[in-house]
Every structure is written in structure tokens, then in C-alpha cells.
Amino acid sequence: MLEQLVESWQINHRVTVKLLDALADDALHATLSTRGGRDVARQLAHVHEVRLMLAELTSKTNRNAKLPHFAKGESPTRKQLQTAFGASAQGVETSIREGWANDGQLPGFKRGVMPLVGYLIAHESHHRGSILLTLKQTGHKLNDELRWGLWDWNKL
């Protein structure tokens, strides 16, 4: 069961990276906000920061690891996001494994390791949907392989 839970997390991570990798550079700056809201890059940075917040909250190993953070309001580059996502995905995996070894209990997240993974996957799915809608409404075309491939977890 542990390996299935870790694999579920890693598939979710690969979906987010697949979306990032498919975006044109100008798409990272797309936004629907007229009042300074997050562009696509900032939405992705937010996803990374939430991963880190929970990874550091639930694991002393992660708190001591000096994981890479973005400044509030920063709109990172693709390369910065790719590097950051690799680190935060590993941090979450560390929390999963440590929680599993502790009968599913995690410091700082009272519901335990399985609800933590569910929360993170739901959070990232929400933001991926928001990003796809932003891209569609700002005229950025996404190919069918990306639009439908994000849902084919058997191939990711």
C-alpha cells in the first residue's frame, strides 16, 4: 500500500510537470486578472509553496533540508519551476514515507498521511484546471495530447 500511495503522489507530480513542460514561454505570463492576480507561473509557484509548507510542517527531515522557496509574488521561469517541483515532490514523498512509518500519523497534519496526499492532489488538480481555463480564455492553444494526456494516469 505504501508504494501505491507514493506512486499516486508521483503520478500527480508528473501530471503537473507535463503541463509545465508543454507550455509556451509566453503562456507562463498569461492571466485573467485585471488587478494583479497570479499569472500561470505564479500559480505554479503557489503549488510548489503549498507542497513545501506541508512537507516542512510534517517532516523534520524536510525542515532541515533547506528546500527552495519562491518570494511572494515572484513569477519564476520554467527552469526554476522544474527544479523546484523536483525538490518539493521529493519533500512530499519524504513526508509520506515518514508518516507511513509512524502508523500514518504526521506532526502538524492531524488527519494523517492519506488525507495529506488527498489534499495535495486535490489542490494541484484545482490549480491545473484554473491554469487550463486561463490558457483557453487568453487564446493559448493546447494540443489534444496534453488536454487528454493529463488524465491518462496509466501512461504517466
Spans of model-derived segments:
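Short, contiguous alpha-helical
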Residues: 6-10, 14-17, 27-69, 106-156
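Helix-adjacent hinge/juxtasegments
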Residues: 56-96
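A structural signal for well-ordered alpha-helices, especially hydrophobic packing surfaces
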Residues: 20, 51, 89-96, 128
